[in-house]
Amino acid sequence: MKLRENWREQKKRNSYGEQPVLDTIKMLNQLGIWIEVTTLVIPTLNDTEQEFHSIAEFIMSVSREIPWHISAFYPAYKLKYLPPTPFAILNRAREIGLETGLHYVYLGNVTNHGNAETKCPDCGQILIERTKIGIIKNNVQDNRCPNCGMEIAGVGL
């Protein structure tokens, strides 16, 4: 826990904190500008269930339609001594996001995990199929699920 505390203190000294980011997300949403949130999950720094609940609850308080991308960390530069993010941790963050009520939660920086698709929040139909580098198939029709007709939030659908 010492590393986590030191990292938080250093983050506070070297930045304005997270509040300007949170305020910007709220403002952009109020202005009707499409936004997506990405969290790079770094082992020992921001990989607790408490962190995931906090992020998911914040996003949910703004809009359940905001996609949350949960990305794996790989050791590099000044954090070479840390391990890569375990898949189980990423998957737990995804579960927390979905349990909180977010409609669109994705895993990033990992392959062959089966959690990159966009599914209809109402009926579960796969709407968009992806690979690591792009979209394979987009089944959304006029911003609606072709199966149940639910309106699907997004840009360029």
Predicted regions and their residues:
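Conserved AdoMet/S-adenosylmethionine-binding subsite of the radical SAM
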Residues: 1-85
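Short alpha-helix
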Residues: 87-97
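Acidic carboxylate-rich catalytic motifs and surrounding loops in phosphoryl-/glycosyl-chemistry enzymes
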Residues: 108-112, 155
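Short cysteine-rich clusters marking metal-coordination/redox-active sites
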Residues: 120-123, 145-148
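Short linker/helix segments within small regulatory modules
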Residues: 133-142
